[in-house]
Amino acid sequence: ALVTQSNAPSWGLGRISNRQAGIRDYHYLSGTSM
């Protein structure tokens, strides 16, 4: 959730929206990273 933010700016926006849910952040990057 720190190295993918610059690699995936699209999911980054969603991460900011779900910043309250840190666990959801991992799910987001996991789906885009893989």
From Swiss-Prot:
Function: This is an extracellular proteinase with a general specificity for apolar residues.
A GO term for molecular function: serine-type peptidase activity
Active site positions: 33 (charge relay system)
Activity relative to temperature: Thermostable.
GO CC terms: extracellular region
Lineage, broadest ranks: Eukaryota, Fungi, Dikarya, Ascomycota, Pezizomycotina
Lineage top rank: taxon: Eukaryota
Keyword rRNA processing among UniProt keywords: no
Catalyzed chemical reaction(s): Rather non-specific hydrolysis of proteins. Preferential cleavage: -Ala-|-Xaa-, -Tyr-|-Xaa-, -Phe-|-Xaa- in small molecular substrates
Primary location class: secreted
Family named by the database record: Belongs to the peptidase S8 family.
Enzyme superclass (EC): hydrolase
GO biological process, one term: proteolysis
EC annotation from Swiss-Prot or TrEMBL: 3.4.21.65
Keywords: Hydrolase, Protease, Secreted, Serine protease
Record's protein name: Thermomycolin
Annotated localization: Secreted
